[in-house]
């Protein structure tokens, strides 16, 4: 009797062990199916790209006058405020130009005063004392002197403007970058001396494949993961480019269309720039030109909750294709 119960117990234990293995196997298979489905949905349903660039408004700063650089007051990658002096150009030369222009104005003012007095005197005497030709000559001389005075005043205004332009100031708050001029160098008018990356002007340009544009609309939310980072930032689709360059629509020397010879069964999807407005500016944490992965999640509102380990893993995988 004892052996019977022992045998029955062993059979039940074996059955329980077998059922446990089956259950564990089913759970593992189910988890694998769920994981595969999430990966598939993550890669196919949500429009995404790993070809996205942080971008900012950049001002190419070039002087409006030529001359020697006498004072460079900023360093490369320095944060400056609007109106801060960046560099100063040879002011003594332009001070001399202003002084000369002021002297010319004073001369022509005196000349106009003299010609006006002479013209008035002759007009009062009239044709009884002199010929009409002499009166006309006096009036013409006054008119000529008046025009010369106006020209001298314009030259003086331009000289003062150029003197003011010898001090180059920051047009906005931002970071000075690619500074490649030094004191003592001669700088030409119109030649870019430095670039200014505007503060609080950062946005993202995501280059989406044309096959994914149906899921991209103005106002849709987007998740942004900088390359090599686990942080996720959020933004909103601002606009989609209205057109891109058509490389097949070029003309040869005779004006005929030049069509690329593409294989019919190989069609590469074109990439279209999508501008994404960031929810918050990050300063210079991610410089303009650095790369990020973007997922357009649709109309739902994102929050700053930490993503699951699986989602973080998928973001990592996307960085490698």
From Swiss-Prot:
Forms an efflux pump with AaeB. GO terms for cellular component: plasma membrane. Belongs to the membrane fusion protein (MFP) (TC 8.A.1) family. The chain crosses the membrane at residues 22-42. Pfam families: CusB_dom_1, HlyD_D23. It is a single-pass membrane protein. Keywords: Cell inner membrane, Cell membrane, Membrane, Transmembrane, Transmembrane helix, Transport. The keyword Disulfide bond does not apply. Disulfide bonds: none annotated. The lineage of its organism: Bacteria, Pseudomonadati, Pseudomonadota, Gammaproteobacteria, Enterobacterales. Coiled coil: none annotated. This is p-hydroxybenzoic acid efflux pump subunit AaeA.
């Amino acid at each position: 009797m004892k052996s019977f119960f022992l045998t029955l117990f062993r059979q039940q234990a074996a059955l329980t062990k077998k059922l446990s293995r089956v259950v564990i196997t089913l759970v593992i298979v189910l988890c694998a199916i769920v994981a595969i489905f999430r990966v598939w949905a993550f890669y196919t349903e949500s429009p995404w790209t790993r070809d996205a660039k942080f971008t900012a408004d950049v001002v190419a700063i070039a002087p409006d006058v030529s001359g020697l650089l006498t004072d460079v007051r900023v360093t490369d990658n320095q944060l400056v405020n609007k109106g801060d002096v960046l560099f100063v150009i040879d002011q003594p030369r332009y001070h001399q130009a202003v002084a000369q222009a002021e002297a010319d104005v004073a001369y022509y003012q005196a000349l106009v005063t003299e010609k006006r007095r002479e013209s008035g005197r002759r007009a009062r005497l009239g044709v009884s004392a002199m010929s009409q030709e002499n009166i006309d000559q006096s009036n013409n001389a006054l008119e000529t002197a008046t025009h010369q005075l106006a020209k001298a005043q314009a030259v003086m205004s331009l000289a003062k403007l150029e003197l003011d332009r010898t001090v180059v100031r920051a047009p906005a708050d931002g970071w000075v970058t690619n500074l490649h001029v030094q004191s003592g160098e001669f700088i030409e008018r119109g030649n870019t001396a430095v670039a200014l990356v505007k503060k609080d002007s950062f946005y993202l340009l995501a280059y989406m494949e044309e096959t994914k544009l149906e899921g991209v609309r103005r106002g849709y939310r987007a998740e942004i993961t900088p390359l090599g980072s686990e942080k996720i930032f959020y933004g909103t689709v601002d606009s989609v480019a209205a057109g891109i360059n058509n490389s097949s629509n070029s003309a040869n020397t005779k004006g005929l269309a030049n069509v690329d010879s593409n294989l019919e069964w190989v069609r590469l999807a074109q990439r279209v720039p999508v501008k994404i407005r960031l929810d918050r500016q990050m300063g210079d944490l991610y410089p303009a030109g650095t790369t990020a992965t973007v997922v357009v999640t649709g109309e739902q509102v994102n929050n700053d909750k930490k993503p699951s380990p699986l989602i973080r893993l998928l973001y990592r995988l996307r960085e490698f294709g």
